[in-house]
Amino acid sequence: MALDEAPAEARPGSRAVELEIDGRSRIFDIDDPDLPKWIDEEAFRSDDYPYKKKLDREEYEETLTKLQIELVKVQFWMQATGKRVMAVFEGRDAAGKGGAIHATTANMNPRSARVVALTKPTETERGQWYFQRYVATFPTAGEFVLFDRSWYNRAGVEPVMGFCTPDQYEQFLKEAPRFEEMIANEGIHLFKFWINIGREMQLKRFHDRRHDPLKIWKLSPMDIAALSKWDDYTGKRDRMLKETHTEHGPWAVIRGNDKRRSRINVIRHMLTKLDYDGKDEAAIGEVDEKILGSGPGFLR
């Protein structure tokens, strides 16, 4: 049975870590197949999530289909007008970025809807302007590009894990708003999403990945290393939202403990902001303001 409380100690050679959560010491062993009771009980409502249970599956699927029909209309409009759209997906590890992207693109024409998920930079790329390798993937006329993580690596994982210098981090926070103003001036519609989840929910999803043979590939050594760096990531998240939430690049912040509500509201937000032909407001519905808000103040 997984250990619920400190002062119990991690087994020698194990990957168990001692965590401080809400003023209490906990032991979490990701390799133990039994999910600790305290995680299972607290995961969904963690981080003050406003709902007690998931969105009903039937309601979710019916709503998602309507929204995906609207996304097909968006593609026809983009192809007819040459409009360009980019959506950046950032968030906590295991927050559901990939799932939100898949829900968006599932029924779009792959010839003009593209996902960018860059690996670590090559030696050549490390010698270039930081933004250069991202610019190379930007959309052409009529194209919708979605980033599964983006240039905002330099605002989160890189400074937390020591992959950039403090000066590079500070320089990025100054340059990102100017970079995004250039994107807007070029006529590209830029969406930026930060998907947030509670700590217990993150632990539950990590545990699910570890013990599901179809999902274990999603769990990286970086995820394990980050288990004890929650507060560091929180500080970097808050600073990023404060410094880079601008008129040209506003952040839409999503509470992501329920993946269904998260996906629905991500798509609704984009459809609401795009002025495309044949737009069906009734099919889109209203963004849930308990789930999606704007900028750094939403999570306070």
Curated annotation (Swiss-Prot):
Changing Y233A: Strong decrease in activity. Changing D223A: Loss of activity. GO terms for biological process: ATP biosynthetic process. Changing R205A: Loss of activity. Pfam families: PPK2. Changing E90A: Loss of activity. Has low activity with Co(2+) or Ni(2+). Belongs to the polyphosphate kinase 2 (PPK2) family. Class I subfamily. This is ADP-polyphosphate phosphotransferase 1.
